[in-house]
Amino acid sequence: MYQSKEERVHHVFEKIYKHYDRMNSVISFRRHLKWREDTMKRMNVQKGKKALDVCCGTADWTIALAEAVGPSGEVYGLDFSKNMLQVGEQKVKERQLANVKLIHGNAMNIPFPDNTFDYVTIGFGLRNVPDYMTVLKEMYRVVKPGGKVVCLETSQPTLIGFRQLYYFYFRFIMPLFGKLFAKSYEEYSWLQESARDFPGRDELAQMFRDAGFVDIEVKSYTFGVAAMHLGHKR
């Protein structure tokens, strides 16, 4: 039976939620933590501000934002997988973060008014949405003038030799890790497909410009396997 991209992605994350955090560490060799840490430094998040984490998943970046804005700030996490949000809710509860609210919703139609947030982030989620540009424009819409929108995502390595190794790893090794650690071979096969088909850093930077962002900053990580794109709204 035919499944749309959105339906397939929803099925994937509703199934792998229990193993998602562990598998992130396995797949990236824990580098994703360093990538996010560096991205947060570049964002220079200020106390008392308001942030939205789109495709928040199990809320790791949401929590990092909440700690950065402090008790006087507000952070919202948005995701379409209720199972992923349940894991996130437990983390928020354990940390007693009163300034965090997790919302079940769709990145293609963000349920907030225009010009609401100082920061809007999306971490390893943009490649899974049905239409990249629609989501970038939605993020642009809800960020305030002067605010920042940040995407941390897999990218396309350009280093000869390493690029071929990267594709081999994602195509053959990562699904095996999924089967071994999460009993989810098919689901992790999908994740490698989404990473393979995602735009490279220069193409995504142009998409940021097309969505209306200015003063775009791009930073590649670990030979280009991931990249941060940061755009400002005038």
UniProtKB/Swiss-Prot annotation:
<keyword id="KW-0474">Menaquinone biosynthesis</keyword>
<dbReference type="InterPro" id="IPR004033">
    <property type="entry name" value="UbiE/COQ5_MeTrFase"/>
</dbReference>
<protein>
    <recommendedName>
        <fullName>Demethylmenaquinone methyltransferase</fullName>
        <ecNumber>2.1.1.163</ecNumber>
    </recommendedName>
</protein>
<comment type="similarity">
    <text>Belongs to the class I-like SAM-binding methyltransferase superfamily. MenG/UbiE family.</text>
</comment>
<dbReference type="InterPro" id="IPR023576">
    <property type="entry name" value="UbiE/COQ5_MeTrFase_CS"/>
</dbReference>
<dbReference type="Pfam" id="PF01209">
    <property type="entry name" value="Ubie_methyltran"/>
</dbReference>
<dbReference type="GO" id="GO:0009234">
    <property type="term" value="P:menaquinone biosynthetic process"/>
</dbReference>
<feature type="binding site">
    <location>
        <position position="58"/>
    </location>
    <ligand>
        <name>S-adenosyl-L-methionine</name>
    </ligand>
</feature>
<keyword id="KW-0808">Transferase</keyword>
<comment type="pathway">
    <text>Quinol/quinone metabolism; menaquinone biosynthesis; menaquinol from 1,4-dihydroxy-2-naphthoate: step 2/2.</text>
</comment>
<dbReference type="InterPro" id="IPR029063">
    <property type="entry name" value="SAM-dependent_MTases_sf"/>
</dbReference>
<feature type="binding site">
    <location>
        <position position="79"/>
    </location>
    <ligand>
        <name>S-adenosyl-L-methionine</name>
    </ligand>
</feature>
<dbReference type="InterPro" id="IPR014122">
    <property type="entry name" value="MenG_heptapren"/>
</dbReference>
<keyword id="KW-0489">Methyltransferase</keyword>
<keyword id="KW-0949">S-adenosyl-L-methionine</keyword>
<feature type="binding site">
    <location>
        <begin position="106"/>
        <end position="107"/>
    </location>
    <ligand>
        <name>S-adenosyl-L-methionine</name>
    </ligand>
</feature>
<dbReference type="GO" id="GO:0032259">
    <property type="term" value="P:methylation"/>
</dbReference>
<comment type="function">
    <text>Methyltransferase required for the conversion of demethylmenaquinol (DMKH2) to menaquinol (MKH2).</text>
</comment>
<dbReference type="GO" id="GO:0043770">
    <property type="term" value="F:demethylmenaquinone methyltransferase activity"/>
</dbReference>
